[in-house]
C-alpha cells in the first residue's frame, strides 16, 4: 500500500470552544444536568465544530450499496436483485431514507459500489462498478486489496463532497443483501466474540436460518483467522464494498472535521473498523440508535457508545441515524437559545 491516507491525523477537538460551551451550559436557566444527555451532546458538538453554539442544520446523507458473494450460501431471506431495485427506490423517493431526507432538508446521494446487475445506469446514482458484488468469503477474500482501497476512497470522496457542500453533519447508510452476515463476521473477527452472540435474523431469517448463518460465518472466520490482527485486511477479507466505503467516509469526515452520526449494526461495525485503523476518529462519531440486531449492543459497548434512541429498528439505510437528527438539532437549539440566569434575571442557586 503506497498511499495510506487513512492513517492521516484526524482534526483536533477545539478545547476552548468545548470549555466555553460547558461553562455556558452551566449558566442556562435550568438545574445543572437536568437535560441529561442533550447537554453533553451540545457541548460535544461545540468542541467538534469549534463553535460555542453549534449547529447541525446542514445534513449530508450518503447511501452506499453493494452486493455480497456470501449470499450464495443461503444467508439472506431476500434475493440479491433487491439491492439494485432499491437503488431505484432511493433516487425516486420511495425508500424510508428518501422520506426522512426530505423531511430533514438533507442532501441525499446514492453510491453504487458494485452490484450483481452492473449494467445498471440509473439517473441520480453514482455507479462505480468496483465489481459485480464481493466474492464469497467462505472460499477466499471478499475483495482484493485494490478493490478495498477503491471502496475506501469512494467513502472519502463522499466526505469531501459533503465538505464542499457545507455539511455540518454526515450520515452514512448502506444497502446490500447479505451485509448483516458480512458485518457479523467482521465484528466477530475484530472483537473475538462467539459468532452466535453477534449474529441475528438480518432481513428476516427464522431460527434455522440464523443457525445456518452462524455456521457459514464460523467457516469464514476459520479460513481467514491468520489475518485477524490487521483490521484493514480483515475488512477486505470479510467485509463488503459498502462497508469499506462507510469506513472511508468516517475516516474522511474525522480528518476534515465533519461530525458523523452513525446508524445501525452494519454502520457501527464500519465505525469499529475505522477506530481500529485510526483510533482518533472515535471522537467524531456520535451514535444515533441501538437497533434490534443482537450484535449491535455488543459492538456499541466495545466502542463505549451511548446511542440516542432505542426503537427496535433494523432497517439500515441510515434511517435510525436520520431519526436522531431532530434530537441533535433540538440539543443545539436549547444550548444556543435558552437564556442564562443573568440574562433572565433568575437566581442561579436554591434559596
UniProtKB/Swiss-Prot annotation:
Write out the entry's keywords from A to Z.
Cobalamin biosynthesis, Glycosyltransferase, Transferase
Q: Spell out the family assignment given in the record's similarity comment.
A: Belongs to the CobT family.
| Pathway annotation from the record | Nucleoside biosynthesis; alpha-ribazole biosynthesis; alpha-ribazole from 5,6-dimethylbenzimidazole: step 1/2
Q: Name one Pfam family in it.
A: DBI_PRT
Cite the source lineage: Bacteria, Pseudomonadati, Pseudomonadota, Gammaproteobacteria, Pseudomonadales
Q: Which reaction does it catalyse?
A: 5,6-dimethylbenzimidazole + nicotinate beta-D-ribonucleotide = alpha-ribazole 5'-phosphate + nicotinate + H(+)
Q: What does this protein do?
A: Catalyzes the synthesis of alpha-ribazole-5'-phosphate from nicotinate mononucleotide (NAMN) and 5,6-dimethylbenzimidazole (DMB).
GO MF terms listed in the record are: nicotinate-nucleotide-dimethylbenzimidazole phosphoribosyltransferase activity
Protein's name in the database = Nicotinate-nucleotide--dimethylbenzimidazole phosphoribosyltransferase
- Tell me where on the tree of life, at the top rank, the source sits: Bacteria
Catalytic residues, chain numbering? 317 (proton acceptor)
The EC number on file is 2.4.2.21
Task: List this protein's GO terms for biological process.
Answer: cobalamin biosynthetic process
